[in-house]
Amino acid sequence: MRCGPLCRFLWLWPYLSYIEAVPIRKVQDDTKTLIKTIVTRINDISHTQAVSSKQRVAGLDFIPGLHPVLSLSRMDQTLAIYQQILTSLHSRNVVQISNDLENLRDLLHLLASSKSCPLPRARGLESFESLGGVLEASLYSTEVVALSRLQAALQDMLRRLDLSPGC
C-alpha cells in the first residue's frame, strides 16, 4: 500500500507538534524590557540630564516630541525617525542605542502581526538630507535633545504598551 504524503506527514508530526509559537506575552515583556534597557543607556550618558524633553530648540523641530495617540504604527514611525537621527550623529554614545531601536522596531512588528495588522517598514524623515547643515553645526545639541526626547517617548510607549495599543 502506498501512503505517500500522509505517511510523511505522520512521520513529521512529532517534530511539528513540538515547535511552539512564541507567546505574545513574552514578546510584550521583551519589548518592555528592551525599552527599559534603552532608557537606562540614555540615563548613563551624563550630558542628557541637562535638557528637558519639552524644551524647544531652534532648528531642531524635526526631532519628534510626544504624541497624544500612540498606535503601533506611530511608535514604529517615531522610532524610525530617532534611529535615523542617531545614526547620522556618528557618536560613540548612541551606536548601541541605535541598534537597540532596530531591535525594538522588530519587536513592535511582531506585536503588530500578532494582532493581524502587519506594519509596513516605516521610513525616517524624507527631507533629512537637507538637515545635514543643522546636524554638522550642532552635533552635541542635536544629540542631547534627541536623546532627551527619545527617553520621554520611550517612557510613554512603555506606559501605553500596558493598554494594548491598536494598529
UniProtKB/Swiss-Prot annotation:
Presence of the UniProt keyword Nucleotide-binding in the record: no
Highest classification ranks of the organism: Eukaryota, Metazoa, Chordata, Craniata, Vertebrata
Nucleotide-binding among keywords: no
GO terms for MF: hormone activity; peptide hormone receptor binding
Family label: Belongs to the leptin family.
Parts forming coiled coils: none
GO process terms (BP): activation of protein kinase C activity; bone growth; cellular response to leptin stimulus; energy reserve metabolic process; intestinal absorption; leptin-mediated signaling pathway; lipid metabolic process; negative regulation of appetite by leptin-mediated signaling pathway
Location of this chain's protein in the cell: Secreted
Record organism: Ursus thibetanus
Secretion signal span: 1-21
Main function: Key player in the regulation of energy balance and body weight control. Once released into the circulation, has central and peripheral effects by binding LEPR, found in many tissues, which results in the activation of several major signaling pathways. In the hypothalamus, acts as an appetite-regulating factor that induces a decrease in food intake and an increase in energy consumption by inducing anorexinogenic factors and suppressing orexigenic neuropeptides, also regulates bone mass and secretion of hypothalamo-pituitary-adrenal hormones.
Primary location class: secreted
Gene3D superfamilies, alphabetized: 1.20.1250.10
Disulfide bridge positions per record: C117-C167
Official protein name in the record: Leptin
Superkingdom, natural source: Eukaryota
InterPro entries in UniProt: 4_helix_cytokine-like_core (IPR009079), Leptin (IPR000065)
Transmembrane segments: none
Cellular component GO terms held in the UniProt record: extracellular space
Keywords carried by this UniProt record: Disulfide bond, Obesity, Secreted, Signal
UniProt xrefs under Pfam families: Leptin
